Amino acid sequence: MFKNTFQSGFLSILYSIGSKPLQIWDKKVRNGHIKRITDNDIQSLVLEIEGTNVSTTYITCPADPKKTLGIKLPFLVMIIKNLKKYFTFEVQVLDDKNVRRRFRASNYQSTTRVKPFICTMPMRLDDGWNQIQFNLSDFTRRAYGTNYIETLRVQIHANCRIRRVYFSDRLYSEDELPAEFKLYLPVQNKAKQ
């Protein structure tokens, strides 16, 4: 999808405030919902994915199962709200051995397991909003001893709220981020009595 796009800096694949946040995504819902709601903490529109079973409610990008993202930027960043329920996401990458590998992170696992085509790992989320930064190049090298070439697919499962999902060429400090990539928490004005 993005193979022939010049890639540097930031490449966003989901923004909850956009007119069609799931334009390039496919949705699967069983015993749950995927809807846009206003989050009270940030007073802004977010995408909520909830389901009784994490494996049957998710969004996947690209929507067409025969297509791939072709994103070469090595950092995946997701701004996600912890709903204090089971949550998992999966990224499929291509390495320099031309092998498709999957990384699955979840908040209900306690150990990392590396198998030839999938690496599952635990993820700890703080209360409220989290910025998940995933160094795909580093994970590919550490898990498989190969070099990351590109990301083919991203799949985000229940249960979470999403503000934005993007790729970047490196990790950026809060000061370096463009305004629309930051998560603004409303300032609490407490007048002194």
Swiss-Prot record:
Q: Where found, per UniProt?
A: Nucleus; Cytoplasm, Cytoskeleton, Microtubule organizing center, Centrosome, Centriole; Cytoplasm, Cytoskeleton, Cilium basal body; Cytoplasm, Cytoskeleton, Cilium axoneme
Q: Which cysteines are joined by disulfide bonds?
A: none
Which tissues is this protein detected in according to the database? Expressed in trachea multiciliated cells.
Q: Which UniProt keywords apply?
A: Cell projection, Cilium, Cytoplasm, Cytoskeleton, Flagellum, Microtubule, Nucleus
Example GO CC term: the record gives:
axonemal B tubule inner sheath
Family matches, as InterPro entries: CFA20/CFAP20DC, CFA20_dom
Gene Ontology terms: biological process: cilium assembly; flagellated sperm motility; positive regulation of cell motility; positive regulation of feeding behavior; protein polyglutamylation; regulation of cilium beat frequency involved in ciliary motility
Indicate the quaternary assembly: Microtubule inner protein component of sperm flagellar doublet microtubules.
- Give the function comment from the record: Cilium- and flagellum-specific protein that plays a role in axonemal structure organization and motility. Microtubule inner protein (MIP) part of the dynein-decorated doublet microtubules (DMTs) in cilia axoneme, which is required for motile cilia beating. Involved in the regulation of the size and morphology of cilia. Required for axonemal microtubules polyglutamylation.
**What family is reported?**
Belongs to the CFAP20 family.
Q: What is this protein called?
A: Cilia- and flagella-associated protein 20
Query: What organism does this protein naturally occur in?
Result: Bos taurus (Bovine)
What lineage does the source organism belong to? Eukaryota, Metazoa, Chordata, Craniata, Vertebrata
Gene name, Swiss-Prot/TrEMBL: CFAP20
